[in-house]
Regions:
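FAD-dinucleotide binding site
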Residues: 1-313
């Protein structure tokens, strides 16, 4: 509803609008790719019936238990990282087999707002007194009210709604006086933060099929740029967005932009050959190091239950 009410027209994404390449740059035929959804769904359904809270383990361990050898199948591994690790933000070696998909989804199709997702926020922010550039340093509270200390002054009020990202709470960069309850701090420590790294590459011309929404690549390392979003399918911009999932983002985000860019371009040249020209611009996300996030989003790791999320509210 918010997307529909925004000033820009939302465009629906289609996960089936996909072309997948093997690691040698060959396009895999539809008869190989199309059954992957059902294969993955069947595998995860089998795990759902087999695992519960009493015998929870990592998703990778559960997969190996119910289907020995599945993780050695490069197509199944690609589907797991591209869909499951992307959706959750966590590596299958860390995800809870019992609860990894216990979250709720909004109704309707997934959409992209070509003009930017701030089109959703702008009408919501209208008439609100929003102070930018005020980094919160300390929140003091008692029965008489609250006081918030920022990098540019202090604010007092009757109460505060604190929406700090879980990653920021885990880093303890904002002080609370008195400290938050021990039970709350334990839940913050218990729930892991995951990561998804994106590399946006802008080119002079599109050397790929502009009508294809997604490109897949069977990389030799799980999570190493297996998925590309073609922004040209949604807007008049020759942009490909490379995505990295699972454990790989934590490793790759420590490298300089030039090295990451070269690594992604090597894959694009494997996929598209000499037609893959050098990008005009390159933008690398580093959510794990962002001081206002410290991670992309949380996930249900082994030993974590849905109630742990509910009790953070």
């Amino acid at each position: 509803e918010l997307a529909a009410a925004s000033a820009t027209m939302p465009l629906v994404t289609d996960d089936d609008n996909l072309v997948v390449y093997d690691r040698n740059g060959n396009i895999l035929p539809d008869e190989i790719i199309d059954p992957l959804d059902k294969i993955l769904e069947s595998l995860l359904d089998e795990i759902d019936e087999w695992v519960d809270a009493e015998n929870d383990r990592s998703l990778a361990s559960a997969i190996d238990a119910v289907n020995t050898g599945a993780l050695n199948d490069e197509l199944i591994l690609w589907a797991l990282t591209t869909f499951t690790e992307f959706d959750t933000g966590g590596a299958i070696e860390e995800l809870s087999a019992a609860y990894f998909n216990a979250d709720s989804a909004f109704r309707g199709a997934d959409v992209i707002l070509p003009a930017g997702f701030d089109a959703i926020l702008e009408p919501l922010a209208a008439n609100l007194d929003i102070r930018l550039g005020h980094v919160v340093e300390k929140i003091s509270y008692d029965n008489s009210g609250i006081q918030i200390t920022t990098s540019r002054g202090e604010f007092a009020g009757n109460f505060a709604v604190v929406t700090l990202p879980l990653g920021v709470l885990k880093q303890q960069v904002v002080a609370f006086d008195p400290e938050l309850p021990t039970s709350f701090r334990n839940r913050v420590a218990k729930i892991p933060m995951g990561n998804v790294t994106k590399v946006a590459l802008k080119f002079d011309e599109a050397f790929w099929d502009p009508a294809v929404q997604y490109f897949g690549y069977l990389s030799e390392i799980k999570g190493k740029w297996p998925y590309f979003l073609n922004y040209r399918a949604f807007a008049d911009a020759n942009i490909l967005v490379a995505l990295s999932f699972g454990a790989y983002p934590a490793e790759v985000e420590r490298r300089p932009d030039a090295e990451i860019r070269a690594e992604v371009m090597d894959i694009l040249r494997t996929m598209f050959g000499a037609n893959a020209t050098e990008p005009l611009q390159c933008l690398v996300t580093r959510w794990s190091a962002d001081p206002y996030a410290y991670g992309a989003y949380s996930f249900t790791g082994t030993g974590v239950e849905p109630e742990d999320f509910d009790n953070l509210a």
